[in-house]
């Protein structure tokens, strides 16, 4: 088991898992009152990609490219930090990392429907930071066996 750290996030990875943690640069957007003036706003913070298969170098924030490669036993966990404008909103009202059940997973939760796969998405606040947890299972039929593995990975996440 190794520990992955970055951007105020630490993850204790089980054997056979790999991951990466990175942050996006803040976006420059025009201010509403002075459209010609750009201001820096963070719309995305840290992103963690965790998987029990080799992650491609060019995958999207929510696993595009990686999900196309997934087979039945493969699991992908994405922790995506939203901008501070999400704090205090109903979407991020839940506090702390979620614990998932097999019934939480649905093929229709996926950002891209792929035969046999299923996913779940949960929004929450942890350590004063708004997050989305997005999990993809390579096989919806194996969800009873694989959900405990996913929960082990989630329990290994800590945020400062």
Placement of each model-derived feature along the sequence:
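Generic detector of contiguous secondary-structure segments
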Residues: 2-8, 16, 111-121
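Signature of long, low-cysteine stretches enriched in small and polar/charged residues
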Residues: 60-144, 151
